[in-house]
């Protein structure tokens, strides 16, 4: 395919095709597994600051030469060590917020405060044992290093006749996981991510003066950096958007009311009735897609995938073109196929992750739901 589209974009496109084709969106929360899987007996964790204590943390800036005739007015890149104390606190708070471990203890004072030079130093097994014993925990997650790269730019936005001042900071935290019984770290993580700020002004100087100050930027970047490794360490809830067909027949409209009341079983009965009660392929496709969403909400991901595949096959017949056989096919040619295929791809990804997620959540004895509607979940598009 020459182009790819998001589920939301395809939905907006479909809405423009006709008012009779009613779509509503719902927000859902679903659990995604972490990259790491911890043994179920590890219930208590300490988050520690294992970085050098560097008192001088000035930004080291390099300014680029700007070519004439471009919208870019200025651009400079700066490098700095991030604030490890703030990042360690943020890391501990974010892990505690996920409610995965029974207890999260923080030790944000630098373990290597006496270091003369910035360096990474892996904790020895004896140090890990002593820390775990003194803090009363089963294992250690340590922030080992934090580097920041900040890019500041001012450019003219011709379409808005104004200037934009932007700061884009890329954070590079290094995190190690230590178990007392191991002589070496269980793993080392080197994630990275970006945080962005922007301001606007009538002149380049005005836009530049409104930009976030360095001190605030460094603090907020350190807080953000602490959250970056968390998805690699513990399962996390992710927000998603799903779309339901709500028009075309009385059962479909009534089912939409049940969804707003969170009565999914009643909605399913009407969607199934709509699917079985018609030979119209478009109506069957819409009902099938809704039933797929129903099964996803019930955590029956295999059934959800089965119904999404039915919807996809019907969409292929409706659009009268096999998208996989033509590199020239676009959303204009196969809008229904795009919508069903994008949703099916999301379900396949969730299904592939499910065994790992179940393994990671097996430490909890109670019955868990991996999918749930977000508060105020139904919103008409």
Predicted regions and their residues:
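Bacterial N-terminal signal peptides that target proteins for export
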Residues: 1-7
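N-terminal intrinsically disordered, low-complexity regulatory tails that precede a folded domain
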Residues: 21-30, 34-46, 52, 58-67, ...
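A short, hydrophobic beta-strand-centered structural micro-motif
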Residues: 42-51, 122-159, 173-175
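Amphipathic beta-strand/beta-sheet edge segments enriched in Tyr/Trp
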Residues: 142-205
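Conserved small/polar residues in nucleotide/adenosyl-binding loops
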Residues: 370-375
């Amino acid at each position: 395919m020459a182009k790819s589209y998001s589920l939301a974009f395809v939905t907006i496109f479909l809405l423009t095709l006709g008012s009779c084709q009613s779509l509503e969106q719902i927000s859902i929360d679903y659990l995604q597994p972490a990259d790491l899987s911890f043994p179920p007996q590890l219930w208590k964790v300490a988050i520690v600051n294992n970085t050098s204590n560097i008192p001088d943390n000035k930004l080291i800036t390099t300014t680029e030469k700007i070519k004439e005739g471009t919208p870019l007015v200025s651009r400079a890149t700066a490098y700095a060590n991030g604030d490890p104390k703030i990042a360690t606190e943020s890391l501990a708070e974010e892990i505690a917020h996920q409610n995965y471990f029974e207890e999260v203890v923080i030790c944000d004072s630098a373990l290597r405060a006496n270091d003369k030079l910035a360096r990474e130093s892996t904790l020895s097994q004896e140090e890990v044992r002593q820390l775990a014993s003194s803090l009363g925990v089963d294992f250690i997650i340590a922030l080992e290093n934090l580097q920041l790269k900040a890019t500041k730019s001012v450019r003219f936005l011709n379409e808005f006749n104004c200037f934009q001042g932007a700061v884009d900071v890329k954070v590079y935290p290094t995190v190690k996981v230590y178990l007392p019984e191991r002589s070496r770290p269980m793993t080392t993580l080197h994630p990275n991510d970006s945080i962005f700020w922007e301001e606007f002004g009538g002149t380049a100087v005005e836009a530049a003066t409104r930009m976030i100050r360095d001190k605030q930027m460094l603090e907020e970047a350190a807080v953000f950096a602490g959250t970056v490794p968390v998805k690699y360490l513990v399962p996390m809830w992710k927000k998603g958007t799903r779309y339901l067909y709500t028009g075309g027949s009385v059962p479909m409209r009534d089912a939409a009311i049940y969804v707003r009341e969170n009565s999914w079983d009643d909605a399913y009965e009407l969607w199934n009735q709509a699917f079985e009660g018609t030979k119209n392929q478009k109506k069957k496709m819409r009902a099938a897609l809704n039933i797929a969403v129903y099964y996803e909400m019930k955590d029956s991901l295999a059934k959800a995938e089965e119904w999404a595949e039915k919807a996809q096959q019907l969409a292929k017949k409706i659009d009268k073109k096999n998208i996989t056989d033509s590199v020239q096919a676009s959303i204009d040619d196969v809008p229904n196929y795009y919508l069903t295929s994008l949703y099916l791809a999301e379900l396949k990804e969730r299904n592939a992750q499910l065994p790992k997620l179940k393994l990671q959540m097996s430490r909890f004895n109670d019955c868990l739901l991996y999918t749930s509607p977000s508060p105020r979940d139904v919103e008409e598009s």
